Regions:
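Structural recognition of the beta-strand scaffold that forms the well-ordered cores
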Residues: 88-91, 98-99, 148-153, 182, ...
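Bacterial N-terminal signal peptides
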Residues: 9-17
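C-terminal cap/substrate-recognition subdomain and adjoining C-terminal extension
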Residues: 56, 161-278
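Positively charged n-region of N-terminal signal peptides that target proteins for export
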Residues: 1-4
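Substrate-recognition element of Asp-dependent hydrolases with the DxDx(T/V) motif
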Residues: 95, 135-168
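Second-shell loop/turn segments in exported
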Residues: 51-62, 121-129, 150-156, 182-184
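Active-site neighborhood of HAD-like aspartate-dependent phosphohydrolases
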Residues: 79-86, 97-129
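Non-catalytic pre-domain segments flanking phosphatase-related domains
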Residues: 16-91, 257-278
Length: 278
């Protein structure tokens, strides 16, 4: 009888041990799953940049944007009968005219999912940005048509103006001077700079990679408001407004969360999950 009791106790102990091992195993699998999910979401922050760096499709879309822009410009020039002001186009610089993806890729490969303001400030101050696919040929043709070109960028004027002008000149871009390169000082909203140009010029085209590059009053708006504004201006895209693709960064990020770029990875992942499943 004593021997049977001992065997029963041993069986209970073994059963409990297996059960605990199962619980630990389940917890471990859950932890691995969560860690993998976090890594996947964090890595997806660089997938858009990787697409810009490597894909033929990205280059094709850039060429398509500039081909469309030139056709739209020619049509607008023909359809404008009265000309009280000189013709002009307005376009953004970074990821519209100037390509910074190599520098961003180097930064991201060091484990930095997003590039902060100080890094961006220092990087653009080096003046080593490349030309975007199709940008130089397009702007040379615009200039040959007698249309003025204005570069309206949110690079920081006090520090980055001269180096930006030099970078554009080195690459051969026309109208690279202080009268045509308008950076920001106190206000990153481009609307006041657009209005200033529109007083003296008839602006036929706007080009950019961000919704704020167009005269839509979109700065500071929520995701839903941004989408509504775009929807109500649908007829202007592909005609008066030409958008270049940029899945790597932009005001759409801060529209998800004002402090997104400063959040730790897990907090960013929470924001990502929220909108991926919304």
């Amino acid at each position: 009888m004593k021997r049977q009791i001992l065997l029963f106790a041993a069986a209970l102990s073994l059963s409990a041990s297996c059960l605990c091992t199962g619980e630990v195993s389940a917890d471990y699998e859950t932890s691995l799953s969560r860690a993998a999910s976090s890594r996947q979401l964090a890595e997806q922050e660089t997938m858009g940049l990787l697409w810009m760096r490597t894909s033929a499709e990205y280059r094709a879309l850039c060429y398509q944007a500039y081909n469309t822009a030139l056709s739209s410009l020619d049509r607008a020039m023909k359809e404008t009968s009265s000309r009280h002001k000189p013709f002009a186009i307005i376009l953004d610089c970074d990821e519209t005219v100037l390509d910074n993806t190599r520098a961003m890729g180097t930064y991201a490969s060091r484990g930095k999912g997003y590039w902060d303001g100080w890094w961006w400030h220092d990087r653009v101050h080096e003046g080593k940005s490349a030309a975007m696919p199709g940008a130089l040929d397009f702007l040379k043709q615009v200039s040959a048509r007698g249309v003025e070109i204005f570069y309206v960028s949110n690079r920081y004027k006090p520090d980055n103006l001269d180096v930006t002008i030099d970078n554009l000149k080195t690459l051969g871009f026309p109208s690279a001077d202080r009268n045509h390169v308008l950076l920001f000082t106190k206000n990153s909203d481009k609307m006041p700079r657009f209005a200033k140009i529109e007083k003296s010029h008839q602006v036929l085209l706007y080009l950019g990679d961000n919704a704020g590059d167009f005269p839509l009053g979109i700065k500071g708006k929520s995701l839903a408001e941004r989408q509504h504004i775009i929807d109500t201006s649908a007829k202007d895209f592909g005609t008066r407004f030409i958008v270049l693709p940029n899945p790597a960064y932009g005001s759409w990020v801060s529209a998800m969360d004002t402090h997104y770029m400063k959040l730790p990875v897990e907090k960013r992942n929470e924001v990502n999950r929220k909108y991926l499943t919304k």
